[in-house]
């Protein structure tokens, strides 16, 4: 569930850097 919570924050972040987002999400 921690991953899902971080994913929400990830979605809020700029989608310009999708690769970095995925890493930060999980």
Curated annotation (Swiss-Prot):
Keywords: Disulfide bond, Ion channel impairing toxin, Neurotoxin, Secreted, Toxin. The keyword Transmembrane helix does not apply. GO terms for cellular component: extracellular region. It is found in: Secreted. It comes from the Eukaryota. Contains 2 disulfide bonds. The keyword NAD does not apply. GO terms for molecular function: ion channel regulator activity; toxin activity. Expressed by the venom duct. Acts as a neurotoxin by inhibiting an ion channel. The cysteine framework is C-CC-C. This is Turripeptide OL57. It comes from Iotyrris olangoensis.
